[in-house]
């Protein structure tokens, strides 16, 4: 039997989602009959059927936070549908869907949220309903984050498998298309790859398999230019730049041609390291940051960036 939730649960949503819970937006005047309708809608969500996750607009008028809860459930259901359409392994998606269904059913069984309370007047009180719906929002948000982690991991596994299959079964048409994308649409391609740096590095390593040195050189130079054009005046740009730089260095490992390119462009790499890691005196922190970003086992990226920093300090 679950213990009753303390009133401070109202503030948990701020910690978990970053949402701004304001008293003026906390109106929630639901009845037990309304709660029953909400429970039914949540149960339908367990089947990951996006079109079934619908609430009567009057319920949202009574309790505006239900809009966020419904949106979260739809978001997860949509993600599962997309995974089902694009996945290589249906077993993985079935497992994800089953996990989602189990978790939603656990939420539905939560007595603190959905059990009918004694006394009709008490159920209409603003404070109690706000607490119950906030508890529901917390649980749904936790579920959304859990599913997001699982799907991110699955997408990474799928991407790695795709690159492995391309290397084993690369045809002339695959090579030709890859070359076209890298030469003609590098910026557009990088924009897509930069949403996941493990996939980004996988794509670069696929170029090694093609063994087209001219193309590899163009891509290397193109990424360096991209780094150079970035205005590192916001946290998002700095984060992206660091991830690109670190995994660009990962790409150069165990590649003789890129080893030569690295030597040719060493001054530019030096400048990029200082651009995205300007606090050169924080060697240990910089090294830890680099290692947290790299998708290769080698020490080269961390050693190189911290060596650049030491070299810069020695100049002073």
UniProtKB/Swiss-Prot annotation:
Induction: Up-regulated in the salivary glands of fully engorged blood-fed mosquitoes at 6 hours after feeding. Residues 1-21 form the signal peptide. Keywords: Glycoprotein, Secreted, Signal. It is found in: Secreted. GO terms for cellular component: extracellular region. Residues 126-316 are annotated as: Involved in interaction with human CD47. Female salivary gland (at protein level). Saliva (at protein level). Some expression in ovary and midgut (at protein level). Passive immunization against the protein decreases IL1B and CXCL2 expression, prevents macrophages from infiltrating the bite site, protects susceptible mice from early replication of Zika virus and ameliorates virus-induced pathogenesis. Average amount of protein per pair of salivary glands is 47 ng. Average protein concentration in mosquito saliva ranges between 0.71 to 349 uM. Activates host neutrophils; induces expression of IL1B and CXCL2 at the bite site. Promotes activation of human CD4(+) T-cells. Inhibits phagocytosis activity of host macrophages via the interaction with CD47 receptor on their surface. Suppresses expression of pro-inflammatory cytokines, such as IFN-gamma/IFNG, IL2, TNF-alpha/TNF, IL12B, IL8/CXCL8, IL6, in host white blood cells. Reduces host polymorphonuclear neutrophil chemotaxis induced by N-formylmethionine-leucylphenylalanine (fMLF). Reduces CD11b/ITGAM expression in fMLF-induced host polymorphonuclear neutrophils. (Microbial infection) Enhances early replication of Zika virus in the host. This is Neutrophil-stimulating factor 1. It comes from Aedes aegypti (Yellowfever mosquito). The lineage of its organism: Eukaryota, Metazoa, Ecdysozoa, Arthropoda, Hexapoda.
């Amino acid at each position: 039997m679950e213990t009753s939730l303390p009133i401070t649960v109202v503030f948990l949503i701020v910690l978990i989602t970053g949402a701004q819970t304001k008293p003026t937006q906390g109106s929630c005047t639901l009845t037990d009959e309304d709660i029953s309708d909400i429970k039914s809608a949540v149960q339908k969500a367990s089947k990951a059927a996006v079109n079934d996750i619908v609430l009567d607009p009057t319920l949202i008028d009574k309790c505006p936070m239900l809009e966020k809860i419904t949106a979260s459930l739809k978001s997860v259901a949509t993600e599962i549908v997309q995974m089902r359409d694009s996945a290589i392994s249906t077993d993985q998606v079935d497992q994800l869907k089953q996990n989602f269904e189990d978790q939603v059913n656990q939420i539905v069984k939560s007595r603190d949220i959905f059990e009918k309370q004694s006394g009709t007047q008490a159920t209409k009180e603003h404070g109690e309903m706000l607490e119950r719906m906030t508890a529901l929002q917390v649980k749904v948000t936790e579920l959304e984050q859990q599913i997001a982690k699982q799907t991110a991991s699955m997408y990474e596994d799928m991407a790695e498998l795709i690159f492995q299959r391309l290397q084993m079964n690369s045809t002339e048409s695959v090579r030709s298309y890859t070359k076209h994308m890298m030469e003609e649409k590098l910026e557009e391609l990088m924009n897509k790859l930069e949403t996941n740096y493990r996939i980004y590095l996988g794509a670069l390593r696929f170029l090694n398999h093609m063994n087209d040195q001219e193309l590899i050189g163009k891509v290397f130079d193109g990424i360096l230019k991209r780094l150079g054009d970035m205005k590192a005046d916001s946290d998002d740009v700095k984060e992206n730049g660091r991830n690109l730089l670190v995994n660009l260095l990962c790409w150069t490992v165990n590649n003789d041609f890129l080893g030569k390119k690295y030597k040719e462009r060493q001054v530019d790499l030096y400048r990029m390291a200082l651009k995205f890691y300007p606090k050169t005196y924080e060697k240990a922190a910089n090294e830890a940051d680099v290692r947290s970003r790299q998708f290769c086992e080698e020490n080269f990226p961390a050693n190189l960036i911290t060596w650049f920093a030491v070299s810069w300090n020695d100049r002073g």
